[in-house]
Amino acid sequence: MARRAASRAVGALRSDGSIQGRGGRAGGSGAEDARHVFDELLRRGRGASIYGLNRALADVARDSPAAAVSRYNRMARAGADEVTPDLCTYGILIGCCCRAGRLDLGFAALGNVIKKGFRVDAIAFTPLLKGLCADKRTSDAMDIVLRRMTELGCIPNVFSYNILLKGLCDENRSQEALELLHMMADDRGGGSPPDVVSYTTVINGFFKEGDSDKAYSTYHEMLDRGILPDVVTYNSIIAALCKAQAMDKAMEVLNTMVKNGVMPDCMTYNSILHGYCSSGQPKEAIGFLKKMRSDGVEPDVVTYSLLMDYLCKNGRCMEARKIFDSMTKRGLKPEITTYGTLLQGYATKGALVEMHGLLDLMVRNGIHPDHYVFSILICAYAKQGKVDQAMLVFSKMRQQGLNPNAVTYGAVIGILCKSGRVEDAMLYFEQMIDEGLSPGNIVYNSLIHGLCTCNKWERAEELILEMLDRGICLNTIFFNSIIDSHCKEGRVIESEKLFELMVRIGVKPNVITYNTLINGYCLAGKMDEAMKLLSGMVSVGLKPNTVTYSTLINGYCKISRMEDALVLFKEMESSGVSPDIITYNIILQGLFQTRRTAAAKELYVRITESGTQIELSTYNIILHGLCKNKLTDDALQMFQNLCLMDLKLEARTFNIMIDALLKVGRNDEAKDLFVAFSSNGLVPNYWTYRLMAENIIGQGLLEELDQLFLSMEDNGCTVDSGMLNFIVRELLQRGEITRAGTYLSMIDEKHFSLEASTASLFIDLLSGGKYQEYYRFLPEKYKSFIESLSC
């Protein structure tokens, strides 16, 4: 009899195991299998082991906390005669309640555990502590750990304390976290000393709050206690240093990390790459990418995306595309954000052909455009003035089942307003509201700007009143933005009307409003009106500032009324408003433009004696002014002095001197300066190459021109349509048809257009048949074009 009972028990266990084997991990069919296993075991009642039920319940909980709670309730209803939940069962239940955001039910379940006489351990409290901290109730969690757990005879462990530390740091209470850490270390933590996670959490908390000193202090305290940092600790420190662009220190920490036997991971390298990019050191970033590979750490999508983002934001899309291609060759699949980065880069540069090529590739790879990508396309067309194409993209978006969001509508409304199609913009505005989307200030700004531009003042005022009815705050900043846009477009009359409307509805103009309007009149050369605004500003109790006076002085300088500018400059100082370096720059420029070089030199001496920090822009103005007034030797002397100063020069400084030296025939000195770019840590820019190209062509050194062009591309300086057209014109004028044909091909390859002056010269020189023997050297489309003219 006993043997038969034992046999039945063994059979039950085997059967139980076979059922459990059909379970699995969460997700897909595994989760479904776990549900079936639990249901089958529960039907057995006494024949099922609690271990098997708990295992199945845990698998169900991973996929669906609600489904797990439902099955627990069935288990509880079955009663103690069938199967009795144990502490593990309750632990799963508490975890499910907390994950579902029902802390109240989680605490109720814990109360049931205590009521049933179970001895609870620290693990049972873990999900409740996490839930409280996630709800920003860390103080309640601390009360449980520091008081209630001990009252129940439960000793908190290091995991309990680490949850509190993270909760405090997430609430920007890192100082309290540090005090708790010290309590743990001083043996007041119930025998749970801090570990590497404890210290890393607090260090990271201080970094997030911007308190680097306390973060480093905690790091050194950690080392003093003999706790070795892990990769997460080092990553926190390196990421913070890179964010502060302290790249030398970040590299020191990296070297220490490796020396201590902690191997950097992809996140470590990504932080340093991001640091190099954000601090404008792309060469170092690319060099570090190579080091990353040589160290055996494979770059991920984030790594490549960081570099691409930097390059695209700096207009270096060709280099970004090379990195993109390198990424795909290595088998990494770009995400939609990666495509979006490069698409945005192409859109910003107006490279629509490349943009569409990448978009096609993206779709072929199974990634469909989202709202962000469609917005990029719409804005790209808008920038090129191709409104119809932008609207076609908007229609395609709807066809693909994507409902436009507020950002997309904002882009479309903005485009239509800028192109004068305000009525169409209003239709989309109404459609947007009908679809339940709330227009923000940007949308209203576009519409009001568009209506004002079209002289639809009544409708603009209606829209402003509508905004007030909708409870949208119409403050000074909102009006300043629209007034500024109109002023920059030369619509100062419209700006004045907006100013009057602003006052009429009770929004008070501030100093910025007056400065903006004054700038509008100055840009239009209407200095009398600008000066009236200055008087009006003072009459309402607003005090003109440095920007006010600098704007007016600049206005006078622009129309060569230098005496008036100097009178206002004296008035500025007598009013107690101190000039800044921008004010001085304006006056220096005005003096040089009116050939008052002696006065400019005197002002420079005065600036240096006043203790004002002189910027490189000031030196550039002086160098340019001296050169324009044929004082090249004086300029060269100042330039040489600048090279000896602790001042980082820029390409513009070199360009000013190269241009001046070339114009007075000092070609060798100009070439020496061109070569000196690299020794000063600089790269020649577009204007440098254009200056050198003009000189080389002028001297007939055409072989050097080709070499210069190659070095330009090697240095990552992108040639544009203007430069290629210029080179073609110069070569055509010299009768260098063969070489001109080479550069014409480049214009075609880059999808640029011939400028009118280039096309006119081309026709004049070649349509008469004078250079017939050179036809074969021209790109095919130009041959047929010339032949059609000859007929």
Curated annotation (Swiss-Prot):
Q: Where is the composition biased (Gly residues)?
A: 20-30
| Residue ranges, annotated region (Disordered) | 1-31
Query: Where would you find this protein in the cell?
Result: Mitochondrion
* PPR repeat extents: 86-120, 121-156, 157-194, 195-229, 230-264, 265-299, 300-334, 335-369, 370-404, 405-439, 440-474, 475-509, 510-544, 545-579, 580-614, 615-649, 650-684, 685-719, 720-754
The record's Gene3D superfamilies line, in alphabetical order, gives: Tetratricopeptide repeat domain
User: What cystine linkages occur within this chain?
Assistant: none
User: Where is the transit peptide, renumbered to this chain?
Assistant: 1-27
Q: Which UniProt keywords apply?
A: Mitochondrion, Repeat, Transit peptide
Q: Give the matching PROSITE patterns.
A: PPR
Give this protein's Gene Ontology molecular function annotations.
mRNA binding
Q: Which GO terms describe its cellular component?
A: mitochondrion
Chief localisation class: mitochondrion
* Family matches, as Pfam families: PPR (PF01535), PPR_1 (PF12854), PPR_2 (PF13041)
InterPro entries membership: Mito_RNA-Proc/Resp, Pentatricopeptide_rpt, TPR-like_helical_dom_sf
What is the stated purpose of this protein? Reduces the expression of the cytoplasmic male sterility (CMS)-associated mitochondrial gene ORF79, encoding a cytotoxic peptide. Can restore male fertility by blocking ORF79 production via endonucleolytic cleavage of dicistronic ATP6/ORF79 mRNA. Promotes the editing of ATP6 mRNAs independently of its cleavage function.
Q: What is this protein called?
A: Protein Rf1, mitochondrial
Origin species, per record, is Oryza sativa subsp. indica
